[in-house]
């Protein structure tokens, strides 16, 4: 189903909405607003089982891609629904060492029950309307084609949520899109860095070409390495905080490619 924003009807004056109509009836919509209000925080908390939300949640932020009234959307609420709300912290990779080094953290003492404190939205590939069919495919996104310089018809980069993990790292989910004459490319990226412990990147990529205007290729991947592994591989420290460079240095843990077919008129 299309992503629903809590308190969607109560938009702030500081609210930016952009719509771009594209080839073959595609419509790209982005919404950007401020960090969520106390009222929105309460609404999120009621709809989620997490004992703690990221420090910065942009409740109304959204990116959606629509054709013939069917959409795939990306929003913070649906992403946070994919965060593990019951896993014991010590069972999360690297968490035992992280907790041991930070016994005095006030935030950790306030945890009511175990959950994924990194806010990793595992397997969140976007929110799909039921009318869109999904099937596995051997097709791959043509990245060489994407390297060809073209006129950018539309570009947006939207942050969904972010947390500094008590100043011990960074957890950030964002989604960006660019449209060109040959098609459009969208990347949702979750970047996680837990100092002295690990780095994780979870990507969802969407690509639609004018050659196949009724379908989207969707690639989902999870990559991760411990800090020790990065040091052993001599990955420069400067790359650890570079969200564009670091994925190529991480170990691929999971990958899947699907074809999304949108209904015709």
Q: Could you describe each region identified by the protein language model?
A:
Residues 5-52, 65, 167-173:
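Short, basic/low-complexity N-terminal boundary segments at the transition from targeting/disordered tails
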Residues 2-20, 24-27, 32-33, 223, ...:
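A composition-driven surface/loop motif
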Residues 40-142, 146-155, 159-244:
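Acidic, low-complexity, intrinsically disordered interaction modules
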């Amino acid at each position: 189903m299309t992503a629903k924003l809590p308190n969607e009807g109560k938009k702030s004056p500081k609210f930016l909405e952009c719509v771009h109509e594209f080839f073959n009836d595609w419509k790209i919509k982005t919404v950007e607003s401020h960090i969520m209000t106390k009222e929105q925080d309460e609404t999120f908390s009621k709809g989620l089982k997490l004992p703690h939300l990221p420090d910065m949640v942009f409740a109304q932020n959204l990116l959606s891609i629509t054709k013939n009234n069917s959409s795939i959307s990306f929003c913070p609420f649906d992403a946070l629904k994919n965060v593990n709300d019951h896993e014991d912290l010590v069972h999360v990779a690297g968490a035992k060492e992280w907790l041991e080094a930070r016994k005095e953290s006030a935030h950790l003492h306030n945890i009511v029950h175990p959950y994924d404190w990194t806010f990793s939205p595992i397997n969140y590939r976007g929110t799909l309307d039921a009318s869109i069919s999904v099937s596995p495919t051997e097709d791959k996104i043509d990245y060489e084609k994407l390297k060809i310089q073209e006129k950018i018809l539309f570009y947006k980069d939207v942050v969904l949520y972010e947390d500094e993990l008590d100043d011990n790292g960074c957890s950030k989910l964002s989604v960006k899109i660019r449209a060109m004459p040959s098609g459009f490319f969208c990347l949702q990226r979750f970047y996680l860095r837990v100092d002295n412990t690990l780095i994780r990147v979870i990507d969802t990529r969407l690509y639609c070409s004018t050659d196949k205007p009724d379908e989207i290729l969707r690639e989902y991947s999870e990559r991760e390495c411990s800090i020790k592994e990065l040091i052993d591989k001599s990955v420069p420290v400067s790359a650890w905080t570079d969200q564009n460079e670091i994925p190529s240095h991480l170990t691929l843990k999971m990958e899947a490619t699907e074809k999304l077919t949108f209904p015709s008129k």
